[in-house]
């Protein structure tokens, strides 16, 4: 378990992990990925809270700074996946052509638009949550955590890997139902602290998980399976949906 967690931290963050401890990304590391979400969620919540003390609760800067720190802490891994997946979904042709577009180093108009939207919406939602007090700050951490749980769900036993995907072939179909149920239960429990009313947090994370699952299902149909980019895009989508829904609900 320690080796799997070290691998997940090495893959999903800039935290230095000795090569002798980490291993190639696989089933165990994917199971441990939500723990990385806890670390990054705490970081994002801390940055947003600290920045709100400096710039005030109504400024958009706290949330945008938190998103910037997350991009640095993850080496931009998932936001790059958003761009690649958007370009792949936006092109015409068979799955092989779409996958080739995703592997291309350049970013097209769909990718640029998707990245701008994710950063702007996610940052704005984080800022709105920071103005809602301690519950809102907790909601930021829960949103980041929800993204990683969604990635685990995307690797459930029935999901195949896309042809030629290195990461997809190592993690697709590796997660048993027991792991999925366990992480979903933890996420739902954690979400109770993310909003004033007990139903609001669970409603937000359920909406996010459903959105991420629908994206993954569509990508399986379009690409023939999942890739690392698809999982990264699902992480960002679920994080953003959780934050947006919570930002709307905390005002009720």
UniProtKB/Swiss-Prot annotation:
Annotated localization: Cell membrane
A molecular function GO annotation: adenosylcobinamide-GDP ribazoletransferase activity
Superkingdom field: Bacteria
Keywords: Cell membrane, Cobalamin biosynthesis, Magnesium, Membrane, Transferase, Transmembrane, Transmembrane helix
Predominant location category: membrane
Pathway listed: Cofactor biosynthesis; adenosylcobalamin biosynthesis; adenosylcobalamin from cob(II)yrinate a,c-diamide: step 7/7
One example of a Gene Ontology biological process annotation: cobalamin biosynthetic process
Cofactor: Mg(2+)
Protein name as it appears in the record: Adenosylcobinamide-GDP ribazoletransferase
Lineage start: Bacteria, Bacillati, Actinomycetota, Actinomycetes, Mycobacteriales
Annotated gene: cobS
């Amino acid at each position: 378990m320690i080796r799997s967690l070290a691998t997940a931290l090495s893959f999903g963050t800039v935290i230095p992990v000795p090569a002798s401890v980490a291993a190639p990304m696989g089933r165990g590391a994917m199971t441990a990925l939500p723990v990385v979400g806890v670390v990054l969620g705490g970081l994002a919540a801390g940055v947003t809270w600290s920045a709100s003390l400096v710039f005030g609760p109504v400024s958009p800067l706290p949330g945008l700074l938190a998103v910037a720190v997350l991009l640095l802490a993850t080496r931009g891994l998932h936001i790059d996946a958003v761009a690649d997946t958007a370009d792949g979904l936006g092109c015409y042709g068979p799955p092989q052509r779409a996958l080739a577009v995703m592997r291309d180093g350049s970013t097209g108009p769909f990718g640029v638009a998707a990245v701008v939207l994710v950063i702007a919406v996610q940052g704005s939602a984080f800022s709105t949550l920071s103005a809602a007090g301690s519950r809102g700050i907790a909601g930021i951490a829960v949103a980041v955590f929800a993204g990683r749980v969604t990635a685990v769900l995307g690797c459930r036993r029935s999901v195949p890997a896309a042809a030629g995907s290195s990461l997809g072939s190592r993690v697709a179909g590796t997660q048993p139902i027991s792991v999925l149920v366990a992480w979903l239960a933890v996420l739902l429990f954690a979400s109770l602290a993310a909003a004033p009313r007990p139903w609001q947090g669970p409603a937000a994370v359920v909406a996010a998980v459903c959105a991420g699952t629908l994206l993954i299902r569509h990508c399986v149909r379009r690409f023939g399976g999942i890739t690392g980019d698809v999982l990264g895009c699902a992480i960002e989508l679920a994080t953003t949906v959780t934050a947006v829904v919570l930002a709307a609900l905390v005002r009720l």
